[in-house]
Amino acid sequence: MHISRLALDHYRSWSQVVVDFVPGVNILFGKNGLGKTNLVEAVEVLSTGSSHRTSSTLPLIERGQTTATIRANVADDAGQTTTYEASIHARGANRARINSGSSLYLRDIIGKIPSVSFTPEDQRLVSGDPGARRTMMNQAAALLEPGYMQTLQQFTRIAKQRATLLKQLNANANNGQPMDAVLSGLEIWTGQFIEAGVVLTRMRAHVISLLAEPFAAIYADLAGAGEQVTLTYAPSFDEVLMFNDPHPQISEHFQRIYPGEVARGVNLIGPQRDDMNLDLAGIPAREFASNGEMWTMALALKMALFEIVRDRLGLQPIVILDDVFAQLDDSRRAQILDFARKQDQVLITVAAEGDVPDYESAHRIDVAALAEPASVILPTLGNLSDLRENESLGKYDGKTAVDSASVERKVS
């Protein structure tokens, strides 16, 4: 499986761009600020429904616009091409289409184009705050757990409503206003919060259990003989790991922390506070592991995710190496390059073409050239949103819109 063509419309810095990829290694090179990362991030969003760079969809949309569109032609091993389209909205639900068909939710196409991204921020999976690790859990579970994104979206909506009621209770208490109606509403939303939270927690627990063994094995292979690593789940609803039916215990927990929640106006427990533990020799790695050990753990974690997604979905994920080579020493650079050579498709971004060792068969894309207005404007190109009227991306009146390294971009 590989992406043969990617088209973006009002996505971050790109007003309009169409770029061709090939099976194997694709190297996107160019100075920082040209939009290399935005191109491969769009693949990540189409694949997982989210970006590791932001928890909000608003930054994904070009300034001054209300919608960003991502389209990709994806060729399977049998040579069949399918067009996937995602529409990212500043307001309202994000939508998707397959082969210009009926409108779907974005979550309905997650996993159709599996990908695993390696980024400069990966070290934060070990050293950073829990938010980075939750983002990875969400992206992994979106690929591996059917219905996960729908459950996550439902939980997020419930959590926001419950937090609003907690703030209202605090305000009513301070102003001497009645609280009975708000308390009744809080009880209802707390029940829904627990129900959705337990489902979410169990899904995440399953994903972490899948990753734990290959993570340890891959780390040992990368690092050689030495300390052992472990990966465990640290749910806020730890009752889920202790009881078959944890609802009563979680409800009691909420009763104990009720005063604190009202005082602060936030949900003090729940999946929004989950974490995962990465330990080296039985000690939290973030507390004492070296920079090199943290990078090796991060690489092992992403490689383990690749392995599990490949084995469970029966598809070879697209590998994204986004500006990682400057962060790695020679040994780890060689390890990740050896891993990349074995994959169906790899998208590599670098600041300079020489930053990555030579691949004889690599398809090289000069991002600076992509950013330049085309010398010839095809009269039938129009807005990229019109592409769905054609049989596939890149077909305009029977002509190919762009060749392997060219692009059409309209700069506003």
Curated annotation (Swiss-Prot):
Main localization of the protein described in the UniProt heading: cytoplasm
Origin: domain of life: Bacteria
GO molecular function, one term: single-stranded DNA binding
Binding residues for ATP: 30-37
CC terms in the record's Gene Ontology section: cytoplasm
One Pfam short name: SMC_N
Classification via NCBIfam families: recf (TIGR00611)
Function field: The RecF protein is involved in DNA metabolism; it is required for DNA replication and normal SOS inducibility. RecF binds preferentially to single-stranded, linear DNA. It also seems to bind ATP.
Assigned protein family: Belongs to the RecF family.
Protein name, as recorded: DNA replication and repair protein RecF
